[in-house]
């Protein structure tokens, strides 16, 4: 399920209690310590992004092999159905990830605004669409099992699961990098406000 995608937890590298920025934080040692934590977090996320890019490259080759076998064993109409299912799966995965983020943000701020109700309604609709797509994929797998072989079906299933996972992971990493850069900007802003003659570099 898309909702079970891995979450990035960098709590050991960067504790929010050590990042209580205020105008009272004046000492250079404290600033350096904060920046070191943020840089460590950025490095970890960038390494994860590099690893993900490598896996995506391998996944592209896997997809090429899968689709080549499909074209050799099924009709053009059936192959077109597969491509449409794959495109729908990617689209709904992006949508569910985005809705999850927005709902979590509303909950964090204890929002009881009507917007939260609408987001939950949209999420329920998205889940129903996802269930229908997954049902169609299961039927497609049964068809493949009888027309190709079970081993190929295992490869196909693993490919689909990794594709969903990597879509969510990429979105999470990009989002995390955005907030890391934001932390750098906040530190620099507070520091230069009190020490205009000094500039912290990222």
Language-model regions: role of each:
Residues 1-202:
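Long intrinsically disordered, low-complexity, acidic S/T/P-rich regions
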